[in-house]
Swiss-Prot record:
Gene this chain is encoded by: xylM
The name this protein goes by in its record: Xylene/toluene monooxygenase hydroxylase component XylM
Protein family (similarity comment): Belongs to the fatty acid desaturase type 1 family. AlkB subfamily.
Function: Component of a monooxygenase that catalyzes the first step in the degradation of xylenes and toluenes. XylM catalyzes the hydroxylation of the methyl side chain of xylenes and toluenes. The electrons are provided by the electron transfer component XylA. The best substrates are m-xylene and p-xylene, followed by toluene. Shows weak activity with o-xylene. In vitro, is also active with substituted compounds, such as chlorotoluenes. Cannot use benzyl alcohol.
Species assigned in the record: Pseudomonas putida
GO cellular component, one term: plasma membrane
Binding site for Fe cation 1: 113, 117, 143, 147
Length: 369
């Protein structure tokens, strides 16, 4: 039964394929899975159960995603070419963009994320190709070499600071990860005695793959469809950065201290756990990044967030996100989970954000002892 949960991944993606095959207003079918899944994730109880799966069939869901995404774009081009999808209809264009964006972000990001942590070259190459669909084909470089080492510290561009909106975070995280990837690639080549300008530099692959998808779609389906692809990639990139935003928002850690159970937010929804390849069962992934997604242990005592779907929607309206989720959750984290040193970092972050210093009196008592 637990293995079957993960087949939600290809089923959701298949909804997009069916929509593009039939064309017309069916192109909205992929995007329509978002509100349906959100309702289920909100009304169903949280799921803290450990998984008992068939590793082969659980892993199969990961390897199906790349051919499914290629098929999704193939059916899009086919639908435009045979007239089933009309790009002169604004609602159909919007449906194409949102379906592509949603499915390129979820479940494609979680699958790509899982595969980039595998040790074999094949899944890692598949992860890079999957990341092309959300506009970040070199995501694995900074993710593995920066985020996993420096999370919850100022050195990690994937950790949003207190008071930061999702809109500014998408930009800062994108710029930060690209800069880190370029720097890491150059250092890697220098250690091998090669020039950073060597053609084996993955930065060239990054640029080539970014151009390849919209370029190929434009060639096969016309420039208008190329623009649809670019728009979907941009939105998908925002969805992708949202995962980091909501899983690490405002958390702090002393760089000299190890990563512990309280250093990530977890979203344990019954739907989002399998759909997200357990990426929302987050903290044990950071403690050991090579643990397979279905082997991650749910940590009921670790910091918890509401449904990730709800967080995404509230995050789009920063005042609501701050008032209803971010401030209450961070106040609880500071008071219940943070070490004394982390409370000092947290209050410095609050002061910078213009937030209340809710631990200041406690810090004063500790200092006076």
């Amino acid at each position: 039964m637990d293995t079957l949960r993960y087949y939600l991944i290809p089923v959701v993606t298949a909804c997009g394929l069916i929509g593009f095959y039939y064309g017309g207003y069916w192109v909205w079918l992929g995007a329509a899975t978002f509100p349906a899944l959100m309702v289920l994730d909100v009304i169903l109880p949280k799921d803290f159960s450990a998984r008992k799966v068939s590793p082969f069939f659980a892993d199969l869901t990961q390897y199906l995603q790349l051919p499914l995404m290629i098929g999704l774009y193939g059916l899009l081009v086919f639908g435009v070419e045979n007239g089933r999808i009309e790009l002169s209809e604004p609602l159909q264009v919007a449906g194409c963009i949102l379906s592509l964006a949603w499915l390129s972000g979820v479940p494609t990001l979680p699958v790509s994320h899982e595969l980039m942590h595998r040790r074999h070259w094949l899944p890692r190459k598949m992860a890079q190709l999957l990341a092309m669909f959300y506009g970040d084909p070199n995501r694995d470089i900074a993710h593995v070499n920066t985020h996993h080492l420096y999370l919850d510290t100022p050195l990690d561009s994937d950790t949003p600071y207190r008071g930061q909106t999702i809109y500014s975070f998408v930009i800062s995280a994108t710029v930060g990860s690209v800069k880190d990837a370029i720097k890491i690639e150059a250092e890697t080549l220098r250690r091998k005695g090669q020039s950073p300008w060597n053609l084996s530099n993955k930065t060239y692959q990054y640029v080539a793959l970014l151009l390849a998808l919209p370029g190929l779609v434009s060639y096969l389906g016309g420039p208008a469809l190329g623009l649809v692809t670019i728009a979907s990639m941009i939105i998908a990139k925002g969805i992708v950065e949202g995962f980091n935003y909501f899983q690490h928002y405002g958390l702090v850690r002393d760089l000299d201290q190890p990563i512990l159970l309280h250093h990530a937010w977890n979203h344990m929804g019954t739907i989002v756990r399998p759909l997200g390849c357990e990426i929302t069962n987050h903290i044990n992934h950071h403690i050991d990044g090579y643990t397979r997604f279905y082997e991650l242990r749910p940590e009921k005592e670790a910091p918890q967030m509401p449904s990730l779907f709800v967080c995404f929607l509230l995050g789009l309206i920063p005042p609501l996100w701050f008032a209803l989720i971010a401030k209450p959750k961070l106040r609880d984290w500071d008071q219940r989970y943070a070490t004394p040193g982390e409370r000092e970092l947290a209050m410095a972050a609050n002061k910078k954000a213009g937030w209340p210093l809710w631990c200041e009196s406690e810090l004063g008592r500790v200092a006076s002892i």
